[in-house]
């Protein structure tokens, strides 16, 4: 309604520190256009605030991930075709999720899991979650949560090298 638009405009003017006693601001030639400009400006401001909050959260998430899983960074093993390596950052995990079309992006928060990526010639094949309590594969998924043709071979490779994960934990 017109009244709510008027009040909304006054609130927005106050928000941006404008003089609400000035006819210049309170009585513009086209109130709707002015209202829409102020709303757009406020929305942009909120977007920037969210972006900054997300940036700060990403930095904090990276610090926490490094603290929790840093002892495993650099761990990789291969069977001459498949290379399995620890995912070493929250951003790398998010990229794994985007590329593989599955929900691994938030797994950096899983305290008792280690996330690895299996590749062939640098191309992601499957993502592996290993329990840090049992050192067993919890799940191993390819693109869109499907198993790749290398699924069993990847699990066998991880199981064969689980002692390397255990050794890193003992050394810490």
Regions found by a protein language model. Give the residues of each.
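Glycine-focused motif/segment detector
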Residues: 2-172
């Amino acid at each position: 309604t017109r009244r709510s638009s008027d009040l909304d405009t006054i609130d927005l003017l106050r928000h941006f520190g404008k003089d609400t006693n000035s006819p210049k601001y309170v009585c513009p030639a086209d109130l709707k256009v002015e209202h829409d400009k102020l709303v757009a400006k406020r929305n942009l401001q909120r977007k920037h605030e969210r972006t900054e909050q997300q940036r700060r959260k990403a930095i904090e998430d990276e610090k926490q991930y490094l603290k929790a899983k840093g002892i495993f960074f650099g761990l990789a093993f291969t069977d001459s075709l498949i290379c399995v390596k620890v995912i070493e950052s929250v951003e790398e995990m998010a990229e794994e999720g985007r590329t593989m079309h599955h929900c691994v992006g938030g797994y950096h928060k899983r305290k008792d899991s280690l996330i690895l990526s299996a590749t062939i010639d640098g191309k992601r094949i499957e993502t592996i979650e290993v329990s840090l309590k049992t050192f067993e594969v919890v799940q191993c998924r390819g693109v869109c949560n499907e198993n790749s043709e290398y699924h069993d071979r990847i699990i066998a490779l991880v199981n064969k090298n689980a002692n390397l994960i255990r050794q890193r934990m003992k050394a810490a």
